[in-house]
């Protein structure tokens, strides 16, 4: 086999060292890190901040007061209302040039701080799961033997494990997209409230998406915990076939 492809010995030693490091890290992740992390997330789910039953407690002040209605008279110093109003608006437009923006009378409109605090705790957990799954996936892939006829039952278990790890990675990445969509959707609604402060439905919609995001964040944490449980259980149950997919494994591994 060595005669078919010439490999630099120094490079080969570095690759072998990399394989050994990945193997050591992955086995430690499955044996120790996964069970510790699932217990940690299970404890996190029991914290008071994630067990609010009255969702009105997570509502935030919009900080956008409803302005007083404008009273228009039929005449003003000999000018009728519409003409005078138009003249005043024309004068203002001439005095102030540039891009028009909505004015926030009470300063910057902040995000829902309670949800932001939860999100800032959840995002590192999502990233951590993606990174650890990637390491374990690489380990299992490196254990897959070369393709040949014979008993490939163990190989199919390896491939199913890799597929499950890849699915977990994709689902975890989708959680990050979900968080981004929440911020974008809320920002658009707040802009609508600034433009149409008298429309109550916009204000109610903001509280609705805040409540929905709170429920979604709790579900995300629950899913992260469950994924650690599932991966730990699946790999431990099939560890023999994952590490030795064939009886003649010593001769068929790369």
Curated annotation (Swiss-Prot):
Keywords: Acetylation, Apoptosis, Cell cycle, Cytoplasm, Nucleus, Phosphoprotein, Proteasome
Designated name of the protein: Proteasome activator complex subunit 3
Organism ancestry: Eukaryota, Metazoa, Chordata, Craniata, Vertebrata
Provenance organism: Pongo abelii
Gene Ontology terms describing biological process: apoptotic process; negative regulation of extrinsic apoptotic signaling pathway; regulation of G1/S transition of mitotic cell cycle; regulation of proteasomal protein catabolic process
InterPro entries in alphabetical order: PA28_C, PA28_C_sf, PA28_N_sf, Proteasome_activ_PA28, Proteasome_activ_PA28_N, Proteasome_activ_sf
Its job: Subunit of the 11S REG-gamma (also called PA28-gamma) proteasome regulator, a doughnut-shaped homoheptamer which associates with the proteasome. 11S REG-gamma activates the trypsin-like catalytic subunit of the proteasome but inhibits the chymotrypsin-like and postglutamyl-preferring (PGPH) subunits. Facilitates the MDM2-p53/TP53 interaction which promotes ubiquitination- and MDM2-dependent proteasomal degradation of p53/TP53, limiting its accumulation and resulting in inhibited apoptosis after DNA damage. May also be involved in cell cycle regulation.
Subunit structure: Homoheptamer; the stability of the heptamer is essential for the specific activation of the trypsine-like subunit and inhibition of the chymotrypsin-like and postglutamyl-preferring (PGPH) subunits of the proteasome. Interacts with p53/TP53, MDM2 and MAP3K3. Associates with the proteasome. Interacts with CCAR2. Interacts with PSME3IP1 (via C-terminus); the interaction is direct and promotes the association of PSME3 with the 20S proteasome. Interacts with COIL; the interaction is inhibited by PSME3IP1.
Modified residues (N6-acetyllysine): 195
């Amino acid at each position: 086999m060595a005669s078919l492809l010439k490999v630099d010995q120094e490079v080969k030693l570095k690759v072998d060292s990399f394989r050994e490091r990945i193997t050591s890290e992955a086995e430690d992740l499955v044996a120790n890190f996964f069970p510790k992390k699932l217990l940690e997330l299970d404890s996190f789910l029991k914290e008071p901040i994630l067990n609010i039953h009255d969702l009105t407690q997570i509502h935030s002040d919009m900080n956008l007061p409803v302005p007083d209605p404008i009273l228009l008279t039929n005449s003003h110093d000999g000018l009728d209302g519409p003409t005078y109003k138009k003249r005043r608006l024309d004068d203002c437009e001439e005095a102030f040039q540039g891009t028009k923006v909505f004015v926030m009378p009470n300063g910057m409109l902040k995000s829902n701080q309670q949800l932001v605090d939860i999100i800032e705790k959840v995002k590192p957990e999502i990233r951590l799961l993606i990174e650890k799954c990637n390491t374990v996936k690489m380990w299992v892939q490196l254990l897959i033997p070369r393709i040949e006829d014979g008993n490939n039952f163990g190989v199919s278990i390896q491939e199913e494990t890799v597929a499950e790890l890849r699915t977990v990675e994709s689902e975890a990445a989708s959680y990050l997209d979900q968080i981004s969509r929440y911020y974008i959707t809320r920002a658009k609604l707040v802009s609508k409230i600034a433009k149409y402060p008298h429309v109550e439905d916009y204000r109610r919609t903001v509280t609705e998406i805040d409540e929905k995001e709170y429920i979604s964040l709790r579900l995300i944490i629950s899913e992260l915990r469950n994924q650690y449980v599932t991966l730990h259980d699946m790999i431990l149950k099939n560890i023999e076939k994952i590490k030795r997919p064939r009886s003649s494994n010593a001769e068929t591994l790369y």
